[in-house]
């Protein structure tokens, strides 16, 4: 280590202290991970300089052979990791090692505090860029010496991980470009000075990073520990399952094994290679708005970026891996990537291939596909919401799988649904809800189930959005059962139950009583509903809410109100089931005795029941309680 001047002691950002404690506590059985993280950071530093040097060749100082060197001093119990990458100046050291972005840190801390497993934390630290601090698991002190490319002054950062760090200027400015990390190991961690222990860790975690990793032996010779050959340049048959697993770990930052591997060399209009993985485990931050793409773009094996390039659409953000193209210029800027025609062609080709492979998998092994769908189905359906995404809409819909009233736990395709449609049925019917159990119990389904008409059950939040964008599949309209009461009337001949047919045959006298009661109900409920009508869909429940064709879906309207994007609440249609014992008794009572306070209370309570079943907030809870008490008091008189 070099002598220093102008030292300044600073305190860690408050969040760093929390991370240090939690990482060390959570990873005590996975200490190897610290070396993976430090080598990964060194590789990133080389990537950054390699990219920057494309526009400023002077930055590399005639030293363009990027590498990472690991050495040890067993007598002093020290471990060294150095690279000749971009390096850091004083402010970089403070920003990168003394603070962490608050949004990412808090999510990281939340995940650990929520009981994330030790292996889960291993994956999290790489995802959030807090892996550097894992060095304090094995080191009593960490010293970082660095000189940034293009600058002449080097700096030192050091800390015991106790809440403070010291920044100093290196007195001798002959320090090489890049970064050297010195770990003064704890006495019990001397195993990490063993050459074979280090080789095992590198082989396990860092074998396929893009730069050579060397071990500096006692003779001063550099022994290569990894294969820095780009794994994606090999043919499919040359890559073993173990190699895929190691590379997947490097690029994915999630646990488990890849669920699907997509390795293709494309030599058509645009030449590129992709090595993409779909994980078998859902990342914890899959739906976080700050989540970045995890597919890296290379040009002729030179890393360009994984940020600010829409080569992978958001609805495929579960993909991990790389795309390498020889058709893009090496000096392309991140800005010009946005509207690049070659990028757009690669994107279209990738989307096409992914959706095609997903459809094949769904058709050949639905049991295995169900695992994918439970992890990433709701993400894939986000693509249906994009109004501009009409090109792949049919392919997306073909890859989608749904639960339905046809089977309790089997997933179906829309093709399956269409094949089972009843004669005379013109629509694909669906119902949205919060969860499968509650949707299956919805009164909205009763008339469809009794007539043997299948209904698709949608329970992901995204379903409320795409069903307002997608109007049909293979020219068959999609329709919510909440709007389908008139359809059931037209499909009455499809009833499979004689009992239902008999129920639909009413005497003139009975029909008049029902019509009169419906008018009375509309008068009592007045401004609380848009209308009251006899339901064609209810068989077991007394009431339900409905909306007219062309009206906004109930759940979508509620969402927009909650997001302050809608400042009113529309009135709904109240449907009543005149065959339900409660409603039948009310109709008879009204026909025999006319209007009454009890009937008014019952109508309000039935409306409230319908609202509760649809997840609607009651307009007046006190009124609901008072009417309920009045009815209960009458029962116990």
Swiss-Prot record:
Query: Which cellular compartments is it found in?
Result: Cytoplasm
Major subcellular location class: cytoplasm
What are the TM regions of this chain, as residue ranges?
Answer: none
Which residue ranges are recorded for the region named B?
A: 335-558
> Which spans of this chain does the record mark as coiled coil?
none
Q: What Gene Ontology terms describe what this protein does at the molecular function level? A: ATP binding; ATP hydrolysis activity; ATP-dependent protein folding chaperone; unfolded protein binding
Q: Name one GO cellular component term.
A: cytoplasm
Q: Does the keyword Endoplasmic reticulum apply?
A: no
The cross-references to PROSITE patterns, in alphabetical order and at most eight, read:
HSP90 (PS00298)
Region C, annotated ranges: 559-637
UniProt KW Nucleotide-binding keyword: yes
InterPro entries per record: HATPase_C_sf, Heat_shock_protein_90_CS, HSP90_C, Hsp90_fam, Hsp90_N, Ribosomal_Su5_D2-typ_SF
**Keywords for this entry?**
ATP-binding, Chaperone, Cytoplasm, Nucleotide-binding, Stress response
Give positions of region: A: 1-334
Task of the protein = Molecular chaperone. Has ATPase activity.
Family (UniProt): Belongs to the heat shock protein 90 family.
Known partners and oligomeric status? Homodimer.
Q: State what protein this is by name.
A: Chaperone protein HtpG
**Organism listed in the record:** Ehrlichia chaffeensis (strain ATCC CRL-10679 / Arkansas)
Q: What is the lineage of its organism?
A: Bacteria, Pseudomonadati, Pseudomonadota, Alphaproteobacteria, Rickettsiales
């Amino acid at each position: 280590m070099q002598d220093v001047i102008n030292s300044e002691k600073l305190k860690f950002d408050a969040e760093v202290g929390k991370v240090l404690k939690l990482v060390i506590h959570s990873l005590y059985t996975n200490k190897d991970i610290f070396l993976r993280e430090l080598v990964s950071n060194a590789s990133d530093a080389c990537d950054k300089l390699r990219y920057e040097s494309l526009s400023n060749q002077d930055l590399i100082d005639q030293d363009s052979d990027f590498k990472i060197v690991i050495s040890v001093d067993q007598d002093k119990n020290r471990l060294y990791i150095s690279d000749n990458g971009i390096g850091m100046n004083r402010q970089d050291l403070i920003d990168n090692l003394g603070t962490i972005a608050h949004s990412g840190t808090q999510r990281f801390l939340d995940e650990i505090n929520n009981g994330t497993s030790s292996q889960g934390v291993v994956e999290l630290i790489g995802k959030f860029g807090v892996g550097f601090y894992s060095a304090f698991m094995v080191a009593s002190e960490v010293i970082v010496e660095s000189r940034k490319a293009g600058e002449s002054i080097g700096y030192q950062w050091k800390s015991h991980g106790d809440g403070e760090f010291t920044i100093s200027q290196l007195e001798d400015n002959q320090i090489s470009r890049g970064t050297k990390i010195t770990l003064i190991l704890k006495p019990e961690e001397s195993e990490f000075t063993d050459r074979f222990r280090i080789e095992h860790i590198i082989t396990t975690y860092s074998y396929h990073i893009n730069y050579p990793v060397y071990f500096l032996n006692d003779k001063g010779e550099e022994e290569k520990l990894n294969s820095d050959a780009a794994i994606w340049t090999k043919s499919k048959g040359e890559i073993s399952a173990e190699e895929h697993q190691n590379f997947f770990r490097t690029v994915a930052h999630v646990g488990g094994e890849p669920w699907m591997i997509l390795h293709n060399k494309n030599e058509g209009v645009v030449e590129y290679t992709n090595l993409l993985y779909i994980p078998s485990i859902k990342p914890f931050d899959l739906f976080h708005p700050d989540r970045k793409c995890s597919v890296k773009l290379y040009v002729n094996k030179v890393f360009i970026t994984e940020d600010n390039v829409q080569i992978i659409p958001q609805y495929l953000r579960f993909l991990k891996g790389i795309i390498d193209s020889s058709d893009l210029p090496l000096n392309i800027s991140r800005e010009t990537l946005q509207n690049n025609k070659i990028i757009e062609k690669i994107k279209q080709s990738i989307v096409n291939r992914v959706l095609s492979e997903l459809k094949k998998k769904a058709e050949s092994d639905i049991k295995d596909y169900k695992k994918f769908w439970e992890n990433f189905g709701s993400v894939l359906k986000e693509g249906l919401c994009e109004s501009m995404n009409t090109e792949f809409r049919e392919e997306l819909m073909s890859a989608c799988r749904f639960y339905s009233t046809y089977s309790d736990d089997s997933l179906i395709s829309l093709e399956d649904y269409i094949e089972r449609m009843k004669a005379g049925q013109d629509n694909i019917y669906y119902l949205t809800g919060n969860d499968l159990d509650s949707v299956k119990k919805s009164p909205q389904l009763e008339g469809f189930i009794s007539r043997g008409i299948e209904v698709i059950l949608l329970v992901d939040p995204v379903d409320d959005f795409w069903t307002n964008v997608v109007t049909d599949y293979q020219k068959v309209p999609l329709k919510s059962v909440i709007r389908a009461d008139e359809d059931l009337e037209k499909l009455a001949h499809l009833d499979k139950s004689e009992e239902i047919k008999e129920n639909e045959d009413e005497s003139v006298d009975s029909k008049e009583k029902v019509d009169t009661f419906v008018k009375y109900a509309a008068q009592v409920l007045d401004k609380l509903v848009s209308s009251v009508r006899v339901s064609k869909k209810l068989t077991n429940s007394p009431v339900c809410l409905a909306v007219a064709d062309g009206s906004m879906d109930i759940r979508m309207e509620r969402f927009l109100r909650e997001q302050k994007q809608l400042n009113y609440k529309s009135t709904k249609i109240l449907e009543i089931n005149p065959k339900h014992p409660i409603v039948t008794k009310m109709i008879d009572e009204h026909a025999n005795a006319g209007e009454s306070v009890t009937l008014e209370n019952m109508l309000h309570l039935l409306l409230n029941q319908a609202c509760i079943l649809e997840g609607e907030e009651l307009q007046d809870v006190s009124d609901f309680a008072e009417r309920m008490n009045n009815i209960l008091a009458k029962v116990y008189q």
